[in-house]
Curated annotation (Swiss-Prot):
Keywords: Coiled coil, DNA-binding, Homeobox, Nucleus, Transcription, Transcription regulation. GO terms for cellular component: nucleus. Residues 88-147 bind DNA. It is found in: Nucleus. One of its GO terms (molecular function) is lipid binding. It holds the Pfam family START. Residues 46-57 have a biased composition (Basic and acidic residues). This is Homeobox-leucine zipper protein ROC7. Residues 256-494 form the START domain. It comes from Oryza sativa subsp. indica (Rice). Residues 26-98 are annotated as: Disordered.
Length: 749
């Protein structure tokens, strides 16, 4: 203030006295704030930021002028006054109505006048420049306070609306009941207070952050401007399930009375159970032969409500497995959430899958929060193990630590009028409790996968020969899922290799395009073989005969307008039996080219030559080959054999199909493999128990074209011929592997 006085020494003494009185007012401001009326004009140290004391005095725009009282306005500096002298009485000068109107009009045009504009106003209105300056400061403070109050009221009303909506959801979930039996709907082991209040707290924290951001960034702006400048929270700051609401989603499958909050609660509860199941150790999981076993009593204590009561008609299966796979975590999540890629990745386990409804697409750019209703059919490569069909929710979420989780859970008890009900799982024979995997990013493009399978299934139709395998989890458990995933990830890495020479290839493959086409053709061959063994409904097989362990199950299918299969009537014969030798020995025998003539009718006693070889992983048993049979007495010189061999801890496969030479040349040159017609045959080899040290369970399956006319009638002679062929092959394999010196029966030509 002293510098200001020095810069204006040429002004009149009266002005100097007023400046001095203003300075004295600041000295006394803190002591007499409670005495000031709401319309006092005060001084400030800065031009845009009024002190907090001035906020309390600016309610009416600052239209009064406060000066020192007493006689004629004379007096010296505050430092020259007697400290014992009683402070003079203050007096206030209210601005005239004309002055206020002029100041208000100028404020609308320019709320921040500069020094020149303030001096002009002071001359026009008969005020001091400092009075004009402080009036504008207080006016801006007043406007800021009003806008703050308006915005806070709006946000408070919005917050109350969210609380009311939350209470409605709470009441709906608390009173949820099964529409068929009227009983309570069990939607997870978490109570509402454990989970929904947690969601409410998270949402309220978001609202607090939002209000704070507005107050810090947009204070002083009109409410409309704030709304336009501060859009709704971006997807990354919202719950992933907030993206639900795709037009038409859920209407067809769930019905018109589809309860979206209940489905959300089911998915969230399943996700939390999966994460805990994957992370907890003993006593929930205990070491067992071939892996880990779930403690049922501890599970009941850890998840007291579970996801509905267990059905007494279904047997519980639970398993957990962990592995590091050669696939990027983002790519793995993408494959799990795409039904086509998921089916191809696990073609030996999933014979059919479909996405029925997409309830949430998740956050843009990834699958965080994606929620969809799916159906699937799971298979075991044997006619003695029935397939398992189910419908389930699949929910994907990225957790704060970066870990991805994908969980499946059946919809039992939630769906009415769409094949649902209180116990639809018992009718279908399969129910998925929270099952899925946690995916953690690892260096160099690898991912750590922890897989949990927890299902209830009806195993009454499983043949006694396969019950030890099914009960141990090697048939449908986490160990098989993870082993298949490891093997398939290595296969995909091999398919993406750009250097043909360094990838273990040999023979006629010269380009990476031809290599990928050949691998794609082999992939389709394996999927067709597995679907034929189990009589999957996807592949439209009709069972003609076969029920016992020694029986051959014969199925038929008509192929029309399918470029991937020859037109006509196709017979599929499959049988399973036990061999008293380890699976590795059976696998090595069946994939050995030198012993192929001992069992393969296609070789017809000729010499088998490998023309191309593609290594599919670290295990030398995982490979795709192109074989030629050299037989001087055969007229099939134009026939090649495409073969894929694969093995892992839970089983092995040797699958092959005759292919035309011309069509195969197109594939080797990078052509479309979908137009190559093939009928696969082959073997599935499984250990007969979880220890893997006993015998083997071998499944043999042939697909044979018996008539090229699709409308022709199937003759009994064709069925008898196929039965004889598979019986002959089984006897030859038994004789060769077990060392039986007996003469194998001749196979039909």
């Amino acid at each position: 203030m002293q510098s200001l006085l020095d810069g204006h020494h040429h002004q009149l003494p009266s002005l100097l006295q007023q400046h001095h009185n203003g300075h004295h007012l600041l000295d006394q401001h803190q002591q007499h704030q409670h005495q000031l009326p709401p319309q006092a004009t005060t001084t400030s140290e800065s031009d845009g930021r009024a002190p907090r004391d001035e906020l309390e005095m600016s309610k009416s725009g600052g239209s009064d002028n406060l000066e020192s009282g007493g006689g004629g306005g004379g007096g010296g500096s505050g430092d020259d006054q007697d400290p014992n002298q009683r402070p003079r009485k203050k007096r206030y000068h209210r601005h005239t109505q004309h002055q206020i109107q002029e100041l208000e009009a100028f404020f609308k045009e320019c709320p921040h006048p500069d020094d020149k504009q303030r001096k002009e106003l002071s001359r026009e209105l008969g005020l001091e420049p400092l009075q004009v300056k402080f009036w504008f400061q207080n006016k801006r403070t007043q406007m800021k306070t009003q806008h703050e109050r308006h915005e806070n009221n709006a946000l408070r009303a919005e917050n109350e609306k969210l609380r009311a909506e939350n209470m409605r959801y709470k009441e709906a979930l608390a009173n949820a009941s099964c529409p068929n039996c009227g009983g309570p709907a069990a939607i997870g082991e978490m109570s509402f207070d454990e989970h929904h209040l947690r969601l409410e707290n998270a949402r309220l924290r978001d609202e607090i952050d939002r209000i704070s951001a507005i107050a810090a960034k947009y204070v002083g702006k009109p409410a409309a401007a704030v709304s336009a400048a501060y859009p709704p929270l971006p997807p990354s700051n919202r719950s992933p399930l907030d993206h639900m609401g795709i037009p038409g989603a859920g209407a067809d499958v769930f019905g018109a009375d589809f309860d979206k909050p209940l489905v959300i609660e089911l998915a969230v509860a399943a996700m939390e159970e999966l994460v805990r199941m994957a992370q907890l150790g003993e006593p929930l999981w205990a070491p067992a032969l071939g892996g880990e076993a779930l403690g049922e009593e501890e599970y009941a204590r850890t998840f007291p409500r579970g996801l509905g009561p267990k059905s007494p008609e279904l047997r519980s299966e639970a398993s957990r497995e962990t592995a590091v796979v050669i696939m990027n975590h983002v790519s793995l999540v993408e494959m799990l959430m795409d039904v086509g890629q998921w089916t191809a990745l696990f073609s030996s386990i999933v014979s059919r899958a479909a996405t029925l409804e997409v309830l949430s697409t998740g956050v843009a750019g990834n699958h965080n929060g994606a929620l969809q209703l799916m159906s699937a059919e799971f298979q075991m490569p044997s006619p003695l193990v029935p397939t398992r069909e189910t419908q389930f929710l699949r929910y994907c979420k990225q957790h704060p630590d970066g870990t991805w989780a994908v969980v499946d859970v059946s919809l039992d008890g939630l769906r009415a009028g769409a094949g649902g009900g209180c116990q639809p799982a018992a009718a279908r024979g399969h129910r998925r409790r929270p099952s899925g995997c946690l995916i953690q990013e690892m260096p160099n493009g690898y991912s750590k996968v922890t897989w949990v399978e927890h299902v209830e299934a009806d195993d009454q139709m499983v043949h006694n020969l396969y019950k030890p395998v099914v009960n141990s989890g090697m048939a449908f458990g986490a160990r098989r899922w993870v082993a298949t995933l490891e093997r398939q990830c290595e296969r995909l890495a091999s398919a993406m290799a750009s250097n043909v020479a360094s990838s273990g290839d040999a023979g006629v493959i010269t380009t990476s395009e031809g290599r990928r086409s050949m691998l794609k053709l082999a992939e389709r061959m394996v999927a067709s073989f597995c679907g034929g063994v189990t009589a999957s409904t996807t592949h439209q097989w009709t069972t003609l005969s076969g029920s016992g362990a020694e029986d051959v199950r014969v199925m038929t299918r008509k192929s029309v307008d399918d470029p991937g299969r020859p037109p006509g009537i196709v017979l599929n014969a499959a049988t399973s039996f036990w061999l008293p030798v380890p699976p590795s020995r059976v696998f090595d025998f069946l994939r050995d080219d030198s012993t192929r003539s001992e069992w393969d009718i296609l070789s017809n006693g000729g010499v088998v030559q490998e023309m191309a070889h593609i290594a599919n992983g670290r295990d030398h048993g995982n490979a795709v080959s192109l074989l030629r049979v050299n037989n001087a007495n055969s007229n099939q010189s134009n026939m090649l054999i495409l073969q894929e061999c694969c093995t892992d801890a839970t089983g092995s496969y040797v699958i092959y199909a005759p292919v035309d030479v011309v069509a195969m040349n197109v594939v080797l040159n990078g052509g479309d493999p979908d137009y190559v017609a093939l009928l696969p045959s082959g073997f599935a080899i499984l250990p007969d128990g979880p220890d893997g040290g006993g015998g083997s369970l071998l499944t043999v399956a042939f697909q044979i074209l018996v008539d090229s006319v699709p409308t022709a009638k199937l003759s009994l002679g064709s069925v008898a011929t196929v039965n004889s062929l598979i019986a002959c092959t089984v006897e030859r394999i038994k004789a060769a592997i077990t060392g039986d010196n007996g003469v194998a029966p001749p196979c039909p030509r």
